[in-house]
């Protein structure tokens, strides 16, 4: 039978909603009772899908004073419109303040009276009212220097105020430029181009049940020293009866073996082996459908352009973990390079041979593992690819040199989905 005549027993799950409608059914190894298990109501997320923490601070003592004491961090953290409004008000307040001071000096010196009445040299030339004093304040702080108004040696106080306003203007400018540059250079936005899969999966990997999720980098610039970590968050009651609403338990992603450090050039599947030390060791597929927990995944590294540390976060609720699924391949070899097809990044396919028991029961040999030579989705892709390559080679051999060149030309423009792919493990 040819590759095109084979039936594909693996169903593709392309969205989060499809994964939530999966039912437990009897697999090839006899696990499962065929009943539909209803999930409990979804708990509130501690970390949202976009990485934001779902928390709100309340009843904080001296919140305003504490935020004002760290004014620079406050200006960097607030929204752009508020930061620009603050600096605009700061400039306007300084201009008004020194404008009022110069106006008071002029009033005290009698500069607002006609020059013929007193015959003295004014403290500030061409200042005959508050508006003129305000314009002189703006010219002094911004160093515009139109030339109509200037300070004379008649009033040392006016000279001192010009020096003071120049210093205040430099301080405001430096603070504003520093805050804007720090806000623009923050690595927070770099996390927007770091991608996590919509779902996590549980499947066999080298004979062991593993929790897996996928991460990817949408930019060609690298994340230096990239490493991942994960935590399981769920409510817990201690032996003394204390209720902990968000108990955090570390999930090992290969720290001892160095597997937590990744070279994030192409999408990588992060793996957590469900062993005796795993908090998921006693959870089966049926338990997963009714359990209440959240897995927070974190990707950290340095931005290549700025060497600043960035952090991307996401989370998976229990109903977002697909038992008995694997991720579709996204990395394919094409001519002299590798191509990444992000249209398959979030897609998974079901593997019915995955045991439905917990890893604990699997270790205790209560259930038999399926054959390691069982047919899988990647194998089918590889067979289809080889069959198509053989057909193409056969057609090319039957053509002449000129016809062979004509045959190769449209193949270079074939869409990515139509080109022969190799299995992910062969690349």
Curated annotation (Swiss-Prot):
Selectivity filter, short sequence motif: residues: 143-148
Segments on the Cytoplasmic face: 1-77, 184-427
Residues holding K(+) 3: 144-145
Extracellular topology ranges: 105-129, 147-155
Biological processes, Gene Ontology terms: potassium ion import across plasma membrane; potassium ion transport; protein homotetramerization; regulation of monoatomic ion transmembrane transport
Catalytic activity: K(+)(in) = K(+)(out)
Residue numbers bearing the S-nitrosocysteine modification: 75
Residues binding K(+) 4, per UniProt: 145-146
SS bonds (residue pairs): 123-155
Motif PDZ-binding location, chain numbering: 425-427
Keyword vocabulary terms for this entry: Disulfide bond, Ion channel, Ion transport, Membrane, Metal-binding, Potassium, Potassium transport, S-nitrosylation, Transmembrane, Transmembrane helix, Transport, Voltage-gated channel
Molecular function via GO: inward rectifier potassium channel activity; metal ion binding
A UniProt-annotated Pfam family: IRK_N
Region of interest: Disordered: 387-427
Transmembrane segments: 78-104, 156-183
Site (Role in the control of polyamine-mediated channel gating and in the blocking by intracellular magnesium): 173
Activity control summary: Activated by phosphatidylinositol 4,5-biphosphate (PtdIns(4,5)P2). PtdIns(4,5)P2 binding to the cytoplasmic side of the channel triggers a conformation change leading to channel opening.
Subunit structure: Homotetramer. Forms heteromer with KCNJ4. Association, via its PDZ-recognition domain, with LIN7A, LIN7B, LIN7C, DLG1, CASK and APBA1 plays a key role in its localization and trafficking.
Function noted in UniProt: Inward rectifying potassium channel that probably participates in controlling the resting membrane potential in electrically excitable cells. Probably participates in establishing action potential waveform and excitability of neuronal and muscle tissues. Inward rectifier potassium channels are characterized by a greater tendency to allow potassium to flow into the cell rather than out of it. Their voltage dependence is regulated by the concentration of extracellular potassium; as external potassium is raised, the voltage range of the channel opening shifts to more positive voltages.
Entry's family note: Belongs to the inward rectifier-type potassium channel (TC 1.A.2.1) family. KCNJ12 subfamily.
Name of the molecule in the record: ATP-sensitive inward rectifier potassium channel 12
Gene: KCNJ12
